[in-house]
A protein has these predicted regions:
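A conserved short coil-to-beta-strand element within the FAD-binding core of flavoproteins
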Residues: 1-6
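FAD-site-proximal beta/loop scaffold in flavoenzymes
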Residues: 7-11, 16-89
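Residue-level recognition of phosphate/Mg2+-coordinating polar/acidic sites
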Residues: 26-27, 153, 167
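Mid-to-C-terminal Rossmann-like scaffold of FAD/NAD(P)H-dependent oxidoreductases
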Residues: 66-158
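A short, polar/charged loop-to-alpha-helix boundary motif
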Residues: 156-173
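Extracellular ligand-binding/catalytic regions of CAZymes and related secreted enzymes
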Residues: 176
Length: 176
């Protein structure tokens, strides 16, 4: 609820009230876009933003699982951390574009460790696979033989994570 110009009253689940000049909500894996659509914020699979995390509405930003930044909807911890760092600087007067390096997602299970770095949806790739005694390595190669993504299964393959990640280009490069 808006209280005064720029102030919001927030009611917590336990009934406690807080007053804030800004509200940030980033919860859930599947974006609920109802509120955004009801306020004419542009949406696709998520809330559409530019690299400054700005929506089409003045002074409204989106981060987290709901933010679709330059067509990328990445509901993982690392992209959210990148967004939070950039938006914090922007809200403090230093416009900062979000930077997305190659960010593999690891599923940490002792029996079958799995790491996945999806290839960009707009890049044609062919998969090269290598069977290992305890798993496999699959690399998504573009038409110029560059690694654009990978899947690593098993402890032996997991050791390749850092070296393969360094070969994959940034999803959103650092602003110059």
């Amino acid at each position: 609820t808006q209280v005064d110009a720029g102030d919001y009253q927030i009611t917590l689940a336990n009934g406690q009230f807080l007053v804030a000049d800004i509200v940030l909500s980033a919860v859930g894996l599947q974006p609920n876009l109802e509120l955004a659509k009801a306020t004419d914020i542009h949406c696709s699979r998520g809330i559409l933003t530019n690299v400054l995390l700005e929506t089409n509405q003045a002074d409204i930003y989106a981060i987290g699982d709901c933010a679709e930044v330059n067509g990328l909807l990445l509901p993982y911890v690392m992209p959210i951390m990148q967004q939070a760092r950039a938006l914090a600087k922007t809200l403090n007067g230093q416009n900062t574009q979000v930077h997305y390096p190659a960010m593999p997602v690891a599923v940490k299970t002792p029996a079958a460790p799995l790491t996945v770095l999806p290839a960009p949806i707009d890049v044609d790739v062919t998969w090269e696979t290598e069977q290992l005694e305890d798993g496999m390595i699959a690399k998504a190669m573009d038409n110029q033989n560059n690694v654009r993504g990978f899947v690593l299964l098993g402890a032996t393959a997991a050791k390749q994570r850092l070296s393969l990640t360094k070969l994959v280009p940034d999803l959103i490069p650092t602003a110059v």
